[in-house]
Amino acid sequence: LKQCIADAIMTYGVGSTGSRRLSGNHQIFLDTEQYIANWVGKPAGVLFNSGFQMNSSIFSVLADKTTLIVADKLIHASLIDGIQNSDAQLVRFRHNDMDHLAQVLKKYAHNYSEVIIVCESIYSMDGDTVPIHDIIQLKNEYNAKLIVDEAHSIGLYGVGGNGWINEQGCLSDVDIVLVAFGKAFGLSGGMLLSSQDIVAKMRAKC
């Protein structure tokens, strides 16, 4: 890894020289994004300098005042920061409590044009896993989007380490997958994996 990084620096330099929409959209970024997207199984992806930057910036692109975000009580603090940076309404449900999630959705979802559910696949504090199939059932019932943070499972679970969601066989039911490179990969950075449309918005606005 050290040698690959050194070689890339000598070839591409260390500065982006501009935003992704201008001079900062290098081919090596596009190739890396597509390689990882193919590996995980999503159509496209966008890289971030860090997992924190990713988590704290994406919701201002994804959500507005007509959006309800329903988040597990134990998601990472940077995700909460990102949600609070947006104009969305945040309601949190008790950790892994599907009955409480159902109550929250029943009470609030009809007041908003879009609903986003946010959880982690494996939670960092206790190492427990999300009841993903139950969440997907509620997601479908309320026509919500589902964002799953795989920071603590990517590289450890799934075929070749492609994530816990893949291991559970439900990747197609997850709208956005978030991965971080600071854990199993031993690097830095983060990546959002989703549809071509969502990734294009991220490249344009983040």
Where are these regions (language model features)?
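Short, structured coil segments at secondary-structure junctions
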Residues: K65, N85-D87, Y142, D173
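Active-site C-terminal subdomain of aminotransferase-like
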Residues: Y142-K145, H152, Y157-C206
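Conserved N-terminal alpha-helix of the aminotransferase class I/II PLP-enzyme fold
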Residues: K2-G51
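Hydrophobic beta-strand scaffold residues
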Residues: S16, I69, L90, L146-I147
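Short, small-residue-enriched loops and turns at beta-alpha junctions
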Residues: L22-H26, A77, M98-D99, S121-D126, ...
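Active-site phosphate-binding strand-loop segment of PLP-dependent enzymes
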Residues: V91, H95-V148
